[in-house]
């Protein structure tokens, strides 16, 4: 741990967990989608659900999806910017079993039809933990390069001998 971990990240406030961490969750989720986000269904759990709106968690998540970082002064305007860019988004609450109190589930759709579901938690000091990708348990912070292999099953049928 270094001095900057103790002091917390440079950020637009008010909270390193509810704002800076939420921006990072949105940012990493958008990167995992590998497409321009056009639709986001965001489910908030625990303290994200109960106090997140007052702490700007909602705006921070959208800001991250727009590619902003925690110190971006445009975070408070993220709803306006997202709507201007054509992004549809909605928020609701969810109760998750055995999840960190600052957890969000992001169901994202990209402009080319790509979809992803990310479950992530803000664990303090602006740090995050990605807990699930498309329902599969994972465990990474995105603080260091991470290789993610997405196994896609392709069905290929060859013509039967009678068809030739």
Model-derived features: where do they sit?
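Conserved phosphate/anionic-ligand binding catalytic regions in large, soluble enzymes, centered on
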Residues: 10-25
């Amino acid at each position: 741990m270094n001095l900057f971990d103790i002091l917390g990240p440079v950020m637009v406030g008010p909270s390193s967990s509810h704002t800076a961490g939420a921006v990072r969750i949105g940012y990493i989720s958008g990167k995992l989608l590998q497409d321009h986000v056009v639709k986001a269904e965001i489910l908030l759990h625990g303290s994200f659900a109960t106090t997140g709106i007052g702490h700007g968690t909602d705006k921070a998540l959208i800001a991250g999806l727009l590619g902003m970082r925690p110190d971006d002064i445009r975070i408070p305007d993220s709803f306006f910017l997202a709507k201007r860019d054509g992004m549809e988004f909605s928020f609701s609450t969810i109760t998750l079993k055995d999840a960190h109190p600052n957890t969000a589930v992001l169901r994202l759709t990209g402009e080319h039809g790509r979809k992803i579901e990310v479950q992530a938690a803000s664990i303090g000091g602006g740090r995050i933990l990605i807990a699930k990708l498309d329902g599969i348990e994972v465990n990474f912070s995105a603080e260091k390069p991470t290789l993610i292999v997405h196994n896609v099953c392709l069905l290929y049928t060859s013509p039967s001998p009678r068809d030739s």
